[in-house]
């Protein structure tokens, strides 16, 4: 199993990894009411650690090795993205061996370059999902990539509530576009498919292809609706386009981390019924996870469990409600399992479906 996103070895440029990808560096968010993002990030355990030296409304919020960029600059690409999408994720940054070489490689393979002056950082960028941006950030083994452009106001990478790496983020795309975006990541960066899912709820369904970068640190499932009225369609209407559906961050103690962010006021999607937990050992062999703590907030469990040789393969996960427009967050702990919680997809899908039916976004007819 593995390597997992949080412990994959450092990258080098190679035939297998031609762009030299090395992981997620940041996700950028923007909102018509930026204070809502500040309040949300604080609930999830993030600290405001730096401000841009010449664009003070661009902020860095960190926890462990996870960085969220809050962009409230009125002259930015992000501001234009907000005008089109409302609360949104207008960009993500990838850590790479050499930013300029990664950019040149991507453009040579057909990527659309983005060189306007309204970028968040003065680094190479291309157009990505739904017109959002992908920034390329040099690895910077011994120093921070933010030192040149940001003024630190706190120590970087605070522990927060224990979330220490960005595990994956998921895209929602228009029906028929899943293969297009698979080819985008495959042709430009040599991503490969590691999972395929076909999920059917009571009223709606979706297909999903989970992709991983050659470095193993960037994982992006791509979701496409099975019909014309499902939850992916609902997202696309609300977001006014394709984009990031959710961001997953990892903890070494999901129970303590979840207790903390719940106490901070973060709300979670409704958990499954008690039978799910009572039957969990039938599905996840010989696990010894505390059912009472799982049920407290609705933590889900997946994986093969404890194998004959004593090896553990368990994934624990829980999901927030939608908190940035239609975007939500996932909180996970990996105990030897490198999947996406396939055994819980049905429960998650139906939980989202219930939420959208109750809000009137989709019909139960």
Where are these regions (language model features)?
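An N-terminus-focused feature that recognizes amino-terminal "leader" regions
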Residues: 1-152, 168, 175, 179, ...
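TerminUS-proximal long segments
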Residues: 2-11, 317, 321-365
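Surface-exposed interaction/gating patches
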Residues: 21-32, 152-219, 228-229, 238-274, ...
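Intrinsic, low-complexity N-terminal interaction/targeting segments
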Residues: 69-71, 76, 125, 136-155, ...
């Amino acid at each position: 199993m593995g390597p997992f996103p949080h412990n994959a070895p450092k990258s080098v440029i190679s035939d297998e990894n031609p762009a030299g990808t090395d992981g997620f560096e940041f996700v950028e968010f923007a909102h018509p009411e930026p204070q809502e993002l500040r309040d949300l990030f604080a609930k999830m355990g993030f600290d405001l650690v730096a401000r841009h030296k010449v664009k003070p409304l661009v902020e860095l919020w960190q926890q462990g090795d996870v960085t969220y960029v809050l962009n409230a600059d009125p002259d930015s690409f992000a501001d234009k993205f907000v005008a089109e999408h409302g609360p949104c994720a207008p960009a993500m940054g990838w850590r790479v061996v050499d930013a300029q070489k990664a950019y040149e490689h991507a453009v040579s393979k057909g990527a659309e370059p983005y060189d306007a002056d309204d970028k968040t950082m003065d680094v190479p960028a291309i157009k990505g999902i739904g017109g959002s941006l992908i920034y390329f950030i040099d690895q910077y083994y011994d120093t921070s990539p933010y030192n040149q452009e940001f003024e630190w106001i706190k120590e970087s990478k605070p522990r927060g509530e224990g979330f220490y790496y960005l595990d994956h983020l998921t895209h929602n795309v228009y029906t028929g576009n899943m293969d297009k975006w698979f080819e985008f990541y495959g042709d430009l960066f040599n991503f490969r498919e590691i999972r395929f899912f076909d999920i059917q709820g009571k009223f709606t369904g979706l297909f999903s292809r989970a992709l991983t970068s050659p470095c193993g640190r960037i994982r992006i499932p791509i979701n496409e609706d099975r019909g014309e009225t499902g939850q992916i369609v609902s997202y696309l209407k609300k977001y006014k386009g394709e984009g990031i559906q959710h961001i997953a961050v990892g903890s070494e103690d999901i129970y303590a981390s979840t207790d903390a962010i719940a106490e901070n006021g973060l709300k979670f999607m409704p958990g499954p019924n008690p039978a799910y937990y009572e039957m969990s050992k039938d599905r996840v062999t010989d696990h010894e996870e505390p059912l009472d703590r799982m049920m407290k907030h609705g933590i889900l469990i997946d994986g093969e469990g404890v194998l004959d040789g004593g090896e553990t393969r368990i994934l624990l996960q829980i999901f927030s409600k939608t908190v940035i427009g239609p975007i939500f967050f996932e909180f996970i702990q990996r105990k030897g399992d490198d999947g996406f919680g396939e055994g819980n997809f049905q429960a998650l899908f139906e939980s989202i479906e219930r939420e959208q039916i109750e809000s009137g976004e989709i019909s139960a007819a």
